[in-house]
């Protein structure tokens, strides 16, 4: 899977998300001239619902705000994390099949 992301998203940073020294998830993030985009974010099932995703997203929002850029993410319409994105201020920019493109602006 990682090889796919490296091949198709060469300008994307890959980050291993850790908590208390334990790997808990991954993040693929593109920082483009006009925007930042979360290409992929995932947490291991046993580490979901503990506020780790919210904390990571808040760090990304803070970074985007400092850079004066919007932050985008494609989210499956039925993804339980959709409520988290909305709570953090993301709004639907467009619909693309089973995905909504969500945008956060400073």
Question: Which sequence ranges carry the predicted segments?
Answer:
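Structural recognition of alpha->loop->beta junctions
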Residues: 88-89, 104-106
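Conserved acetyl-CoA-binding loop-helix of GNAT-fold acetyltransferases
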Residues: 49-62, 82-87
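Short phosphate-binding/catalytic loops that engage adenosine nucleotides
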Residues: 52, 69, 90
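Conserved GNAT acetyl-CoA-binding A-motif
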Residues: 35, 64-76
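Conserved beta-strand-loop-alpha-helix junction that forms the acyl-donor binding cleft
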Residues: 44, 48, 72-82, 98-105
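Acetyl-CoA-dependent GNAT
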Residues: 1-40, 44-45, 57-63, 92-97
């Amino acid at each position: 899977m990682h090889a796919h992301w490296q091949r198709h998203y060469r300008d994307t940073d890959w980050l291993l998300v850790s908590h208390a020294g334990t790997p808990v998830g991954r993040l693929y993030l593109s920082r483009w001239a006009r925007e930042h985009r979360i290409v992929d974010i995932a947490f291991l099932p046993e580490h979901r619902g503990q506020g780790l995703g919210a904390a990571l997203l808040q760090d990304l929002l803070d970074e985007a705000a400092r850079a004066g850029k919007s932050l985008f993410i494609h989210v499956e319409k039925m993804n339980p994390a959709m409520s988290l994105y909305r709570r953090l201020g993301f709004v639907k920019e467009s619909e693309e099949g089973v995905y909504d493109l969500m945008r956060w602006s400073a």
